[in-house]
């Protein structure tokens, strides 16, 4: 099960009814934060998400409405008692920006691992943290994060998250591979085991991969030809809808953003299950007034609001 909360759905500047861009995902009690606009700490408190269990922070790009909440949040996480490493993923330039922020944070009780312009990352999800691992055919990770270069006025990344579903134990396979019974349980937990000088791997006792959960996130971009394939068959697609009306197309093109209908066309082409729109222009008072513009292209389109939640489950 993956729990998703829209912490902020505004673009440009915070509004009385909308915080700036941020999304938090919770899987097995560990959290991933997508963007960190001004006020993210406040809306996290409002939604009761907690701070200490954030393991990965993914930044789409370096415009202020997506990163100005980061210095304060990093400080608060430090005050929460966290000592485990945190991964920050972002576009080219993210390292320099974080190093600048750290001037105001001379002491943090945890290490920041900054992954700049990374494209394919694999993580194991443990009880106490998420941990970056090397891609290995013998060991299946719990989470993969892929990025895509978008078309904005500064380097910008889209993100796709694939939560893998644990494979079932296969007795026939375990016996065929002559795996001792005493290591079966550890291999089912995806651990590498050595016994009497022989190494055993989880693939020796587990069946075929099962369909997992896919969430994709693209914000602050024009539509590109690569996006539909990148978001293909996502269970949830969170996408910017800066402008509700096609009458604002000239603004969307000039500022390198999207209209509701453009986002919906991408959702349709990508065959996603649900489109959740976010990052609304301050000029839009009620984004729901424009939802039909999206539904003309993709019926299962919804306007996101601060605090809105989705629960994505593995299919039986």
UniProtKB/Swiss-Prot annotation:
Residues in coiled coil: none
Catalytic residues, chain numbering: 65
GO molecular function: 3'-tRNA processing endoribonuclease activity; zinc ion binding
Pfam family, one: Lactamase_B_2
Binding site for Zn(2+) 2: 65-66, 220, 279
UniProt keyword tRNA processing present: yes
Cofactor note: Binds 2 Zn(2+) ions.
Ligand binding (Zn(2+) 1): 61, 63, 152, 220
Catalytically driven reaction(s): Endonucleolytic cleavage of RNA, removing extra 3' nucleotides from tRNA precursor, generating 3' termini of tRNAs. A 3'-hydroxy group is left at the tRNA terminus and a 5'-phosphoryl group is left at the trailer molecule
Top-rank EC class of the record's enzyme: hydrolase
EC assignment: 3.1.26.11
Domain of life: Bacteria
Cofactor(s) listed in the protein's UniProt record: Zn(2+)
Keywords, ordered alphabetically: Endonuclease, Hydrolase, Metal-binding, Nuclease, tRNA processing, Zinc
Subunit-structure text: Homodimer.
UniProt record similarity statement: Belongs to the RNase Z family.
Protein name (database record): Ribonuclease Z
């Amino acid at each position: 099960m993956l729990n998703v909360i829209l912490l902020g759905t505004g673009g440009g500047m915070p509004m009385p009814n909308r915080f700036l861009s941020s999304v938090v995902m919770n899987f097995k009690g560990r959290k991933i934060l997508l963007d960190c606009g001004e006020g993210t700490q406040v809306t996290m408190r409002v939604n009761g998400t907690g701070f200490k269990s954030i393991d990965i922070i993914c930044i789409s790009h370096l415009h202020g409405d997506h990163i100005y909440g980061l210095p304060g949040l990093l400080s608060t996480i430090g005050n929460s008692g966290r000592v485990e490493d945190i991964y920050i993923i972002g576009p080219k330039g993210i390292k320099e920006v974080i190093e600048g922020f750290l001037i105001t944070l001379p002491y943090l009780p945890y290490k920041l691992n900054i992954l700049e312009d990374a494209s394919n990352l694999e993580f194991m999800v443990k009880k106490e943290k998420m941990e970056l691992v090397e891609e290995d055919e013998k060991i299946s990770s719990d989470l993969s994060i892929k990025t895509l270069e978008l078309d904005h006025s500064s380097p910008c990344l889209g993100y796709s998250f694939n939560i893998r579903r644990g494979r079932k134990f296969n007795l026939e396979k375990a016996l065929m591979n002559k795996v001792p019974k005493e290591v079966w349980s550890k291999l089912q937990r995806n651990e590498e085991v050595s016994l009497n000088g022989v190494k055993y791997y989880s693939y020796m006792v587990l069946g075929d991969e099962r369909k997992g959960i896919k969430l994709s996130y693209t914000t602050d971009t024009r539509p590109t030809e690569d996006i539909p394939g990148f978001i293909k068959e996502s269970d949830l697609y969170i996408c910017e809808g800066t402008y509700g009306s096609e009458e604002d197309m000239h603004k969307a093109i000039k500022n390198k953003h999207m209209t509701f209908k453009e986002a919906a066309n991408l959702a349709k082409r990508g065959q996603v299950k649900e489109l959740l729109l976010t990052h609304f222009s301050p000029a839009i008072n009620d984004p729901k007034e424009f939802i039909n513009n999206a539904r003309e292209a993709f019926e299962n389109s919804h306007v996101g609001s601060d605090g809105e939640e989705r629960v994505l489950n593995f299919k039986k």
